[in-house]
């Protein structure tokens, strides 16, 4: 049956710690209710959603989704967890380790308990001060309520002193938290504030740029692109990488280095018929090596110009960007110096220089 209600459905997002991601509030309400172990109407009544969805419309979606899953014998990831708990068929282990435990939902805590009830020793690692997934159903209170022997790690080997100071000032405002003291590493570090992202000099060093949401990264991409700085967006494929490789292959070919069929095909993809006879690719031996002189003698290759002139079928915007990066001394054969990510998407990461956008608008 069709309800004629539009749902924006996304798959499980591996870049966001494997969390279920959807822009549909109806689906998010249903998912959060299952993670929290509460009824869907209870989650709806919390009014934590942002879209205008009536209770009647929500119930229709919820009932129809259940009917559809039952009709086609379908389950989702959270259903797997609840079915596992009901089955009481956890294997017996000598030792179980649970990491990042502050991010577990109540349903996941129930699953963990069903496992450790049949385990000799269980080690739970986590930090309630790092709990940033409440919005996704994380039950931090269950982490805080755990009993047993506590081993506190009092020395950080990652956090410099100035970052430690501001972090302690912030966590001190959290009402329900486990009291803890820890020491920063010996380096003082540097903490600076800027009015605009463009004011930050990122021409040297490795950088991690963090924003609240993905759409906030798009404007940063444009700014870094215009400056000719080598960067990557963690949530996008680097579309320039193939072109970088073709450029290196072309420059090697001009220097007299042999290249293979795959390299020639890549180069040809950025040339028009004026510079490369595309039909000739089918005559190339895929196991042989080729030099520029041989390709030109056969009239397959018709140019020996510098890459940005020879690659006449490559997007001009990409060509200008790569030329500017090279002028800036960027090492395009290495990984990008600058990584753009969301705060949630980079949890556990580190870098020499970190930029945090304090605009937390949704």
Regions found by a protein language model. Name each.
Residues 1-24, 225-228, 232-239:
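Conserved P-loop NTPase-based nucleic-acid remodeling module centered on helicase motor cores
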Residues 86-89, 199-202, 330-334:
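A short acidic-Thr-Gly-centered motif at the start of a beta-strand
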Residues 92-94, 119, 204-206:
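A general structural motif
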Residues 102-188, 208-226, 232-242, 333-338, ...:
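Conserved helicase motor core of SF1/SF2 NTP-dependent helicases
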Residues 161-164, 214-362:
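Core RecA-like ATPase module of SF1/SF2 helicases and allied nucleic-acid translocases
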Residues 190-205:
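Conserved interdomain hinge at the start of the Helicase C-terminal
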